């Protein structure tokens, strides 16, 4: 197990434990964004922010696919992802945000969203993350799809060449935190929802990475192993 995967699994376990023992932390976090009888997200600018965080990961995936295709058709972009990298990006998006989060948890874990609970003028009583008997029937609070998709941005950042990778990784984590914060502010999710949504995707990213690059290398279409690029040693 690599260090990143160990850290993500450990953080997920800690989050599950902390919010199981002290579920009131979720309510306290939601109350921070609840003012004048409602949450944020009621004006056009705030709704634009939600759409931005929701759409951008898919735009990035399409852009990477376009670069990959352009390279295959004879164009010469400065950089393009390898076929292996495209499999990595598609697989992590489908498995993490797609199958596990949206088709798995959100449609089968019946936790009401903050905006749907009685503590915030909704119809349903609050339930902690581990209680699957809440009043929500579908597209529920646990876990956050937007947080999951937001932290997926770590995947495309991680396959960039070394000069771009570090700042892109910082931007990717900032994007994930921004998407999560917005969902909290809108009353769409509790803190445990966004933490676990993001961590599930990060765990999936690391597992799929180990499957596709079992020796830990990352390739680009020019045939270089990025982990050895400083030595200018082409793969044979």
Describe the role of every protein-language-model region.
Residues 1-67, 104-114, 118, 122-125, ...:
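N-terminal transmembrane-helix/juxtamembrane module of multi-pass inner/ER membrane proteins
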Residues 1, 39-40, 78-82, 128, ...:
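Helix-boundary and loop/linker segments of multi-pass membrane transporters
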Residues 15-20, 94-99, 174-184:
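Aromatic-anchored segments of alpha-helical transmembrane domains
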Residues 10, 14, 57, 61, ...:
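Hydrophobic, lipid-facing residues on alpha-helical transmembrane segments of integral membrane proteins
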Residues 21-22, 65-78, 158-164, 207-212:
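Structural signal for the C-terminal ends of transmembrane alpha-helices
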Residues 35-43, 64-80, 216-223:
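Membrane interface segments of multi-pass transport proteins and intramembrane proteases
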Residues 2-12, 126-236:
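Membrane-embedded catalytic cores of phosphoryl/pyrophosphoryl-handling enzymes
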Residues 67-108, 169:
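Interfacial segments of alpha-helical transmembrane regions
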């Amino acid at each position: 197990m690599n260090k990143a995967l160990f850290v993500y699994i450990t953080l997920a376990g800690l989050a599950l434990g902390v919010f199981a023992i002290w579920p009131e932390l979720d309510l306290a976090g939601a109350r921070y964004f609840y003012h004048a009888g409602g949450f944020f997200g009621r004006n056009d600018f705030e709704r634009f922010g939600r759409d931005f965080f929701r759409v951008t990961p898919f735009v990035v995936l399409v852009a990477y696919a376009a670069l990959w295709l352009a390279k295959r058709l004879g164009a010469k972009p400065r950089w393009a992802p390898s076929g292996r990298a495209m499999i990595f990006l598609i697989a992590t998006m489908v498995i993490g945000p797609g199958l596990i989060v949206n088709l798995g948890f959100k449609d089968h874990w019946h936790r009401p969203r903050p905006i749907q609970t009685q503590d915030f003028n909704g119809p349903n009583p609050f339930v902690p993350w581990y209680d699957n008997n809440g009043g929500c029937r579908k597209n529920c609070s646990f876990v956050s799809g937007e947080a999951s998709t937001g932290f997926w941005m770590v995947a495309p950042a991680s396959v960039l060449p070394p000069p771009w990778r570090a700042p892109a990784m910082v931007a990717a984590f900032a994007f994930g935190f921004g998407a999560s914060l917005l969902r909290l502010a809108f009353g769409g999710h509790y803190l445990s929802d966004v933490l676990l949504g993001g961590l599930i995707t990060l765990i999936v990213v690391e597992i799929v990475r180990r499957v596709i690059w079992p020796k830990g290398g990352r390739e680009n279409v020019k045939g270089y192993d990025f982990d050895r690029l400083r030595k200018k040693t082409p793969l044979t």
